[in-house]
Amino acid sequence: HGSGPLPADGPPVRVIANALLKHGVAVLCYDKRGVGASGGTFRHNAYDDFVEDGINAVHYLNSRNDVDHKAIGLLGSSEGSIIAPEIALRSKSVAFVIHRAGIAVDAIECNLWEQRHEQIDRGISGDLLEDSIRLQQLIFEMLVESKKDPKTVESESWHQVDAEIVSFNQKYRSNETWIKHGKRFGNKLADWERFFEGVASAIAYDPQPFIEQLDIPMLYIFAEKDENVPTSASVKYLKSLKMNSSKQLDIRIIPDV
């Protein structure tokens, strides 16, 4: 699945599933937790939930006698792509992974890429664009660090980011483009803490340790001009990994889309 409360029979999933079925490939699609026929509660960006559900789906396939247990693969799109390597590694019984709109960089980099293009689409550019992205990166990185080490809260580094927020707000408080189209950073890091509680596992997520431990074929399919996924950064990492290891990586880029 991509991000959001998506059902098993949504248009993107249905198209891919039907294509695989026509080639004789059995497909298991499931509603996200808390969506459709699935139990539980859906939580945005709950990667820990999504990983556990994916592992359970693999275990279910392994319990069936009509499935070739040596040929079980994963196909993840966007958000599904970033967690697929962890599912494959922890389930210990996945033969291959296909990544559609693949993500091979950490979630902070992916979020910043998406926010950059959202702001460009709203007419934000130049120093205002660069300053806002830089500040968002500082906020994300400090909040992630604070979850790893609570002592970071109210540290000198924490207050430096607070000062950056104040400086940005003062610099652009009269900027009409930002007032109309920009996002609000609040007045201090503490204003972000409640929001961050709900997305901490997603913002701090990094698929690379799992990718690097996998020893199975992986296909990454990218759109050259994807505004949600940083194609160039992901491809650069994957090519370097392939060059310096024996990884079975196939990288495909669809041009001009």
Each model region followed by its residue ranges:
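Catalytic histidine neighborhood in serine/cysteine hydrolases
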Residues: 242-257
